[in-house]
A protein has these predicted regions:
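Terminal targeting signals and extreme-terminal segments of soluble enzymes
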Residues: 1-285
Length: 285
């Protein structure tokens, strides 16, 4: 009797890399299925960069997990061919360090750098205990009592990324979608993959950038590009929904910070991040 074929998930397909022509070089492809606006979703860049570094750092099976990941994004990514250039900075006993550049060919024959990241890798399975202090998950309505993305505002409604994920916002923090932002600068909700793929460490890294911009809750609609991103991965997530919280405290001079925290279905904190975002200051009338 033939065993049933293993399911093929969109996220895993998007993270497929193949060997390049130089040491530390890998190739990948961005299709049109992870687009937000006209560009490829930044969370996918983070996960792809981590996937390439995992190959470089986990040769001995010691350091399979990103523990910290920091990136800048010089230019916006687009669907098409991707070159990843990885360099190991230090291979340690318990933690290793590396950097990765994500490049794409430009129309004029030059090469555009899309992301440059440095990362710390280790084994989160060996760092699950002891838990001396941690942040508890906020009490929010369950996914079935939250608001889906069916009524996404116009420029998000044309983003193929929404087809790849199931995202639910609490009614209290979804008012911006109806033109009624709370002004608090807070979003609470749930996220999972639309095709049923269960979360892992790379998908937590992706999910840290998967929610709508917290700027929307301030009534700042439009594009808020990520300028710098830093994440800490704290544990392997349990199966099920990921609970996400986004907050901001400072929006000044066209720059804002966005802090994210993610808990798994058991209530364990599995990821946290801070990113510096830009927003366009309205021109004076």
């Amino acid at each position: 009797m033939t065993a049933p074929a293993a399911p093929v998930y969109a996220f895993d397909q998007a993270l497929v890399v193949r060997a390049g022509s130089q040491p530390g070089e890998r190739y990948a492809e961005f299709d049109d299925q992870w687009r937000i606006g006209n560009g490829v979703h930044g969370g996918l860049l983070l996960a792809l960069g981590a996937a390439a570094l995992r190959i470089e750092l986990d040769g001995a099976g010691r350091h399979p997990d990103p523990v910290a990941f920091s990136a800048v994004f010089p230019t916006a990514s687009v669907p098409g061919h991707v070159v990843l250039q990885s360099e190991v900075l230090r291979a340690g006993a318990s933690l290793s360090q590396a950097q990765v550049r994500l490049l794409q060919p430009a129309a004029d024959g030059s090469v555009d750098e899309r992301m440059r990241a440095v990362a710390l890798f280790g084994d989160l399975g060996k760092r699950a205990e002891p838990v001396l202090k941690t942040a508890a998950a906020p009490t929010i309505p369950g996914p079935d009592q939250c608001v889906g993305s069916d009524g996404a505002i116009d420029f998000l409604a044309h983003s193929t990324l929404l087809d790849r994920m199931d995202i639910r916002l609490t009614p209290e923090t979804a008012g911006w979608a109806a033109g009624k932002p709370s002004g608090a600068g807070v979003l609470h909700g749930w996220v999972r993959f639309a095709d049923g793929r269960e979360p892992d460490v790379l998908s937590v890294l992706w999910a840290l950038d998967a929610m709508p911009p917290v700027a929307f809750d301030l009534g700042l609609y439009g594009w808020t590009p990520t300028l710098e991103f830093s994440a800490h991965l704290r544990a392997h997530p349990a199966p099920g929904w990921l609970q996400v919280e986004l907050t901001t405290q400072t929006v000044v001079g066209g720059l804002m910070e966005e802090d994210a925290r993610i808990w798994d279905s058991t209530g364990r904190l599995v990821g946290q991040s801070r990113q510096l975002c830009g927003w366009r200051v309205p021109a004076p009338r």
